[in-house]
Amino acid sequence: MNVPLRSLVAAWSIAVIVTTPVAASPLEDGYVAYRAMDFGKAAEIWQSLAETGDPTAQYLLGNLYADGKGVARDDAAAFKWFRLAADQGNAAAQYNVAASYAAGVGVPKGEVEAATWFRRAAEQGMPVAQLNLGLLHASGTGVAKDSVEALKWFEIAFRGLPAGGPRMDVARAMTDVSANMSGDEINEARRRARDWKAQPQGK
């Protein structure tokens, strides 16, 4: 494939902290502090909430550890908080758990584990997770090689992404994988994509 998995992982992990919706205070207080670049205060607020089991705070705290903002950078701690949030169904955290396994950051590299967590985020409707899952199926990395499933996920990702770079990546991936597929296989992939519905998993 022409789209490197790791570059997509990195791009999403950087962007998602400032685009994830947050609830009313005190979680919002941490978000306001983060946007004001008072990372220490954000870390203090989210740490307190994360320890009570709040999955959004756990996810956000994981990002602070991953980036070394307000706390010392600690990839293992980042993974710990991502995993706790992911286990509660937080899709963004599930994506970052997958990214951690894919790159071997904070946890030993694991292709099967990466695929498992990309799938969980993809099933909740995260387009970049869907793209990555399609790439894994296209290459047979961590999952069975399956062009029909690959194209299915590319089709789903394409309709969920805004115009621009990532959508162009999906279009290229669709072209690449479909070049070696029969008409029946392409139609089956499109049927699966049409029938697919997101399945929210938790908080």
What is the role of each PLM region?
Residues M1-A10:
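Bacterial N-terminal signal peptides that target proteins for export
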Residues Y34-D38, E51-D54, D67-K69, D74, ...:
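Short helix-capping/linker turns of helical repeat alpha-solenoids
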Residues Y59-L60, A92-N96, V128-L135, S147, ...:
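Alpha-solenoid helical repeat scaffolds
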Residues G165-K203:
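Terminal, low-structured helical/coil segments at or just beyond the last alpha-helical repeat
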